Amino acid sequence: MPKKIHQPGGSLYCGVTLLGVLCLVVFRLIPGIPFGTYVMAERDHYHTIDDPNVPCNFYDTVNLTGHRLFPNGSYDYYGTIVPAELVGTYDYIHSSLTERIEVREHVRGCVCKFKSCLNICCPWRQVFNSEVDGCIIDHSDNRTWPDPPMLNITFRNESTILVNMFTQFAIQSFRPCPKMFSLQPETNNWDDYLLFENGSMLRVDDKLLIRKNEFCMVPTYVNESDMFYTIHPANCDMQDDHSTVKIINSYAMMFSIPFMMLTIAVYLLIPELRNQHGKSLVCYLIGLSVGYSSLCYVQLYQVDATGVTCKVFGYTAYFFFMGAYMWLSVISFDLWHNFRGTRGINRFQEKKRFLFYSLYSWGIALVFLAFTYCAQQLTNLPANLKPGIGDGVYCWLDMSNWAAMIYFYGPILAIVVANTIMFIMTAIKIHGVQREMARIIASENSTKNLRTEKDKRFYRAWSNYRFGLFLRLFLIMGITWLTELISYFVGSDKGWSKLFYISDLANAMQGFLIFMLFVMKKKVKHLITNRCSSVRDGSNQRQSQYSTKTTSSSVANLSLHEKPSVEKPLVISSSVDPQKTTIFR
């Protein structure tokens, strides 16, 4: 008897996958390693509101201490009236995009919620001094400051107008990063930039759109002999320690997408896998792959946030992500439904049920898309209640306020909770069925129920397979999304929030994990081998049929070209089988 060849099991692939994820996380945490040119600080988590008791996040506020207070609770901030409902008490400040410092309580106003803000690195007429690591008034500096400072601003109609910085914008004073460099287009052509009316900036050389709180305006000069300052933007240093989160996650998603495509192909081409679970998994992966592709495009190619392309990719990503989450709930429900002990259904009923699932998943995703689009484009809701897709700053959802909870994380939270409940109920049911079967097999009447040892082994294998399917689905599609939600609520300004880099990366690599756990299994690889063998055998059979057809046709053509004879009537070979020819075609 030949020796049985043992192939690598699922545990080995899981170990390799986990090792790869951990290596990527460690690589991401190494400081000073940029991915691409001019990578920016991580862009989503620092937009979350730190304290639910304040009206907006810190980066949309200005310090109102010392400014005029009106009886109705509003403030006058250099001619801009900040209403009372947008005024709050803060006991912290941010010294950079990722560092929070506790300070004495002071009043701040959300002026950026109703007027475009522009950030200056230091209070006006102060300069940054690296020795004291702060802003100072340099009395030895005799250079002249522009009064008033004039800037070329590009508006939505693509016109560029020279405007007074202080009248066009509400001025913030904040240094986004410890290490920064200024753009100087007078000396470097690659330092050209465009400032937009919403306070964002486009760096022309690499087409990078930078948000208002990711850069600041700074006084610059070209030569030491210059006696006047010119105002230009300063960017975060491309080797900032926190600069690679979004970039590495985007590349992880790009790495994951081909594995999703391979998994989809396997489950569509193998007949044994085209059951209800397989088709639901394919639909989930289609939604996830299109969503990942759209998100990678807007993050890596820096699409103009004011253009139509930005909106198209943003809403496309939103629709397919929501569709994927709906299919996630379908998978959980169908798994729970199958373990309830319901009677089997025929093929027609299965197709009907899949059609219902499809209408449910894509239909609800379409409803969410319509609701989100109307909220952004067709309503006069406050800016902090709009999703932010294609608003001139974001191509994806605006994570700077709790509106993201309404349009994205809220529905996901509901789905994850429902899925977790169904997973727990399914686990309880599986455990109960396994105990019952163990009792039956051990009983004296087991021969009446499972008459052969082969039947017993088959049911044990089936039960273990179902439990393994349940466990894989729960780990990949339940735990990872749950940690993503926790990561959103926690934010990234806490020291231990770096732990969520692992879950973020696991989510980005979900396609790779699914491929390893659902395709690189012994049974599935065996089905793939059988499928390839059957296709190869079918090809050989068709080639044989084609050879027979060619020979018969040659005889027929020879007979047709011969001159008919009375003594020898025309005979055309009947060996060409019309049915076989049709099959070949």
Curated annotation (Swiss-Prot):
Keywords: Cell membrane, Disulfide bond, G-protein coupled receptor, Glycoprotein, Membrane, Receptor, Signal, Transducer, Transmembrane, Transmembrane helix. It is a multi-pass membrane protein. The chain crosses the membrane at residues 251-271, 281-301, 313-333, 354-374, 405-425, 467-487, 499-519. The keyword Membrane applies. Disulfide bonds join 56-110, 112-117, 121-216, 122-135, 177-236. Residues 33-250, 302-312, 375-404, 488-498 are extracellular. Residues 272-280, 334-353, 426-466, 520-585 are cytoplasmic. Residues 1-32 form the signal peptide. One of its GO terms (molecular function) is G protein-coupled peptide receptor activity. The keyword Transmembrane applies. Its main location: membrane. Gene3D superfamilies: 2.30.160.11, Rhodopsin 7-helix transmembrane proteins. It is found in: Cell membrane. GO terms for biological process: cell surface receptor signaling pathway; determination of adult lifespan; G protein-coupled receptor signaling pathway; response to starvation. Glycans are attached at residues 63, 72, 142, 152, 157, 198, 223. One of its GO terms (cellular component) is membrane. InterPro entries: GPCR_2-like_7TM, GPCR_2_secretin-like, Methusela_ecto_dom_1, Methuselah_N_dom, Methuselah_N_sf, Mth_GPCR. Belongs to the G-protein coupled receptor 2 family. Mth subfamily. This is Probable G-protein coupled receptor Mth-like 10. It comes from Drosophila melanogaster (Fruit fly).
